[in-house]
Amino acid sequence: MAKLKWYKGNIHTHTTESDGDDTPERVVGWYRRHNYDFLVLSDHNHLTLLDYGSGRRRFKSPLMVPGEEVSANIKGGSVPIHINGIGISRVVEPIDADDVVATIQANVNAIIQAGGIASINHPNFHWAFDHEALMQVTGASLLEVYNGHPKTNIYGGPGKPSNDEIWDAVLTSGRPIFGVATDDSHNYLDWSPTKSNPGRGWVVVRAEELSVDAIVDGLATGSFYSSTGIALSELDVTPSSIELRIQDDGETVHWTTFTGKGGRTLLEVVGQDAQYEIKGDEGYVRATVRASTGARAWTQPVFLGD
């Protein structure tokens, strides 16, 4: 068996093929210069392919994983239902079923039929839907717990759950789904906190090799962690424990929260190393790492029987 390696990538990216402000080639160049191993160009309702037309790779790096943001805007356009299809083999036309749950489910199904995995994007964008809807959806592999677009309301608000709370509610309902951090990048020419710039959120996939199949499989099986700036030097997840080590610069303070069913805090650990021994009655266990800089990282849940 080949040794597993870690590969960093962004799975939510826009170009001038939809509503981004720079060309696909220049966008890919930005991620190459910043040492990303793989990239999904996820233009709205468009499959932006730079590698596959000639049957050979156009760029040495990053690896291009085919994708699309399947975008249905229902109820007169006021409710955006946007779902990334990752690893798809063809364009997926959005389906507008008018009802939120039916629209999500129809587009998830269409992505799977196109050979991809489905990532539910920014549920709090325009307050489109929350855990109540997602509890009724089957087949989705991923959910954005962090989205770098400044208007996606990831932290929620009065009476509105945060993306983390939505994730915990869906997990508590028994729906297995993995949490991703993404850029949702649109702006490469103008940089400010009010713009959707690259480099804000990413996933780090553990795989045997850097290939489309290996990366998509790693995402589908939860063999990754998500981050907005924290790097893990070690991550060991087994049915009996979660152990991690944070890359430390000697100044930043880190703390890790282990979370179980119902969003319950199981343990909080301050420092570079954190470990949780699984008891078996937690429902699931996942870890969130926080830094004094404001950066975060998320491990994927270990699912436990009743």
Predicted regions and their residues:
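A metal-dependent hydrolase metal-coordination microenvironment
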Residues: M1-E132, Q136-G139, V145-W167, S173, ...
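C-terminal functional module detector
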Residues: M1-W6, P24, S173-F178, D183-D306
